Amino acid sequence: METLQDIGTNMLKDELRTPYFMIDEAKLIANLEIAKHLKEISGVKMVLALKCFSTWGVFDIIKPYLDGTTSSGPFEVKLGYETFGGETHAYSVGYSEEDVKEVIDICDKMIFNSQSQLAAYRHLVEGKASLGLRINPGVSYAGQDLANPARQFSRLGVQADHIDESVFDSINGVMFHMNCENKDVDAFIGLLDAISERFGRYLDKLDWVSLGGGVFFTWPGYDVEKLGAALKAFAERHAVQLYLEPGEAIITKTTDLVVTVVDIVENGMKTAIVDSATEAHRLDTLIYKEPASVLEASDKGQHEYVIGSCSCLAGDQFCVAKFDEPLQVGQKLHILDSAGYTMVKLNWFNGLKMPSVYCERKNGQIQKINQFGYEDFKRTLSLWSIE
């Protein structure tokens, strides 16, 4: 396996063709140091949520700080096992028997989403991996209903009033994934207390509890000490090993999507068209209607533009931003905080060029992680032609 030391060394930023993602090693390590401290004061273990960030080319930076990976599908399980190591947790909203057989020999924990799946496949897991079940506690913290695991008619986890209490005698652990971008430590502690009160007598029978992801402990001003104390108290109260499954918390504010202005048009408002698209390269901007932020923008700027994509989707735009000076064709812009749920969702809509991926090392060296070309685009559409 190639490493960062083997490929793409000694590159200069000015030579890089847009669009591309630039991962900043120093910023990544700053987040990881916070994670390390939280682990030390709380005793919690952390597994990286690959659904959020799977760019394995930088896993050598992350591995010394975390305990392994957690996955939402069989290919993520394999990727975590092969490229990260440590503990490999396997979870899926819906397993097939083939899926279970495919990963059971390489995972340490297998977590089922329902009691029916647990009953159907537990015989394949017992003796090979620690057995877990996802519980939906009916409480959550999420800014948008689309990402709320406790939303009405949720399919995520076993509803509290549907649990067969005997199940806790034959599993090793449970997962409660109930947060999305939770920056409020008191709100999280409130969720912890609710879980302890409602499920405590069951948790006392278990070996481990995963509290999922979505806890934004690296957000500026977050009270990590308070979080650590609450996690430690919970683990001691129920005599369990606690896990967190951070994704965004690890890679937030580490990565820019760098684009170039290719045209400027006007239809009631100026639009700077860039060589990228939210539909293809930053999908959550479109899905959640959360405008991106641009490094070069200024709140007090006098020149306002829509930062529009080059896709054919009429509403595909990154944001509206103000600038101190008029934008120029050929100018580069940095779309900030573009690591989480971006590279894992890249697609070939419109046949647009896929962004390359680079890492800026602590010493300033630029190293290539990935690049894509026409053959990659063609291969995703067909490998064979009908006869």
Curated annotation (Swiss-Prot):
Keywords: Cytoplasm, Decarboxylase, Lyase, Polyamine biosynthesis, Pyridoxal phosphate, Spermidine biosynthesis
InterPro entries on file: Ala_racemase/Decarboxylase_C (IPR009006), Nsp_de-COase (IPR005730), PLP-binding_barrel (IPR029066)
Primary localisation category: cytoplasm
Subunit structure: Homodimer.
Recorded family membership: Belongs to the Orn/Lys/Arg decarboxylase class-II family. NspC subfamily.
Cross-referenced NCBIfam families: nspC
Record protein name field: Carboxynorspermidine/carboxyspermidine decarboxylase
Naturally occurring in which organism (per UniProt): Vibrio cholerae serotype O1 (strain ATCC 39315 / El Tor Inaba N16961)
Classification lineage: Bacteria, Pseudomonadati, Pseudomonadota, Gammaproteobacteria, Vibrionales
